[in-house]
């Protein structure tokens, strides 16, 4: 009988302290998440120093809870996986140092994991990844299209040239007057409104898979500013609907076109914005029309969590891609450089 592989995974790249135990690359034995949303809400966004302080306060408890929930001990664990980047450097270092301490104390291999690779592998938990595939990455810090021909091979074929889609959502939400985190609230409002504004769709160069959302963001901000200056009533739901339709149309079109050009019949979506209902429905509709298999994780697996890090860590473990105790956190890591090829 093949021995089960247990990975203890740590994720502290931004404002969630999360620890998970993953068995054999898919089974979640535990996935403890300590959220900081309430602490950052009054600031209208994540404050790095506050995030780091909360990670320091919560990391030990979160590790212990994950082990208890999984009903395992550190002696049962085969390796420690940890997000090394990208992310907030102070936050990353809390998780990296905790993982290094565990690896040293219990003599376990240490596995560095790229945060975006983790988001991609969140899909594998509920629906086995099959290759080749196109991954659409949509989050607060990233908007990318990635071609994968096998496990841990990443070719970035498109990325944002300015704002990430999640960043645009948060800025538009603040302009409308919605509380942090704004993305889910814009999505909720968008379901109630009508597309009454002609906000731009930015396609960039012909056949380009890059994205740009700064122009759209500015168009929304300027529109609301002009209406307020002229005392013209603002129907917030209509603003949200018009903005979201512009975003979703571009994301959907480019993702489907990438699948067609690369001859791929599998599209996966990853990142916090993957929980957006408007985007999920648009992609589902177009994938059905184009006979493309679509996988989007459950909303709880779209946001930052350690389970996704553990799944990616499992495949890195199988490839023997370990780090020594000199491992550091990195605010920026190129996904292609992290690729197995």
UniProtKB/Swiss-Prot annotation:
MF terms (GO), sorted A to Z: iron ion binding; N(6)-L-threonylcarbamoyladenine synthase activity
Presence of the UniProt keyword Hydrolase in the record: no
Gene Ontology annotations of biological process type: tRNA threonylcarbamoyladenosine modification
PROSITE patterns, sorted: GLYCOPROTEASE (PS01016)
Gene Ontology, cellular component aspect: cytoplasm
CDD domains linked to this entry: ASKHA_NBD_TsaD_bac (cd24133)
Catalysed transformations (reactions): L-threonylcarbamoyladenylate + adenosine(37) in tRNA = N(6)-L-threonylcarbamoyladenosine(37) in tRNA + AMP + H(+)
Annotated SUPFAM superfamilies: Actin-like ATPase domain
Main subcellular location: cytoplasm
Cellular compartment(s): Cytoplasm
Binding of Fe cation, residues: 115, 119, 304
EC number, UniProt record: 2.3.1.234
Binding locations of substrate: 137-141, 170, 183, 187, 276
Domain of life: Bacteria
Required cofactor(s): Fe(2+)
One Pfam assignment: TsaD
InterPro entries named among the record's database cross-references: ATPase_NBD, Gcp-like_dom, KAE1/TsaD, Peptidase_M22_CS, TsaD
Free-text remark on how the cofactor is bound: Binds 1 Fe(2+) ion per subunit.
Keywords, comma-separated and alphabetical: Acyltransferase, Cytoplasm, Iron, Metal-binding, Transferase, tRNA processing
Keyword presence, Cytoplasm: yes
Family the entry assigns: Belongs to the KAE1 / TsaD family.
Function: Required for the formation of a threonylcarbamoyl group on adenosine at position 37 (t(6)A37) in tRNAs that read codons beginning with adenine. Is involved in the transfer of the threonylcarbamoyl moiety of threonylcarbamoyl-AMP (TC-AMP) to the N6 group of A37, together with TsaE and TsaB. TsaD likely plays a direct catalytic role in this reaction.
Family annotation (NCBIfam families): gcp_kae1, T6A_TsaD_YgjD
Protein name: tRNA N6-adenosine threonylcarbamoyltransferase
Lineage start: Bacteria, Bacillati, Bacillota, Bacilli, Bacillales
């Amino acid at each position: 009988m093949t021995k089960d592989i247990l990975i203890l995974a740590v994720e502290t790249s931004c404002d969630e302290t999360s620890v998970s135990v993953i068995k054999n690359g898919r089974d979640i034995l535990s996935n403890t998440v300590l959220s900081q949303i309430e602490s950052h809400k009054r600031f209208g966004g994540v404050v790095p120093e506050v995030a780091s302080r909360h990670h320091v306060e919560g990391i030990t408890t979160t590790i212990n809870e994950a082990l208890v929930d999984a009903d395992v001990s550190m002696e049962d664990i085969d390796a420690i996986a940890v997000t090394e980047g990208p992310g907030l450097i102070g936050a990353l270092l809390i998780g990296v140092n905790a993982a290094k301490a565990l690896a040293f104390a219990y003599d376990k291999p240490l596995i560095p994991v790229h945060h975006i690779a983790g988001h991609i592998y969140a899909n594998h938990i509920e629906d086995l990844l099959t290759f080749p595939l196109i991954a659409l990455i949509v989050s607060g810090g990233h908007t990318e299209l990635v071609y994968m021909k096998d496990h841990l091979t990443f070719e970035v074929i498109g990325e944002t040239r300015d704002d990430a889609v999640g960043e645009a959502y948060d800025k538009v939400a603040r302009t409308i007057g919605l509380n942090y985190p704004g993305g889910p609230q814009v999505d909720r409002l968008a379901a109630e409104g009508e597309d009454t504004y002609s906000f731009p769709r930015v396609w960039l160069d012909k056949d380009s898979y890059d994205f740009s959302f700064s122009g759209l963001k500015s168009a929304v901000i300027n529109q609301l500013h002009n209406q307020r200056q002229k005392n013209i009533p603002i129907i917030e739901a209509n603003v949200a609907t018009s903005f979201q339709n512009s975003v979703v149309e571009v994301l959907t079109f480019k993702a489907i076109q990438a699948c067609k050009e690369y001859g791929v019949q599998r599209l996966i979506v990853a990142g916090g914005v993957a929980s957006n209902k408007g985007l999920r429905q648009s992609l589902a509709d177009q994938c059905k029309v184009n006979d493309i298999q679509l996988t989007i994780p459950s909303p709880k697996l779209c946001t930052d969590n350690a389970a996704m890090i553990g799944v990616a860590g499992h495949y890195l473990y199988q490839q023997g891609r370990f780090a020594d105790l000199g491992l550091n956190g990195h605010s920026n890591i190129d996904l292609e450089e992290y690729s197995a090829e």
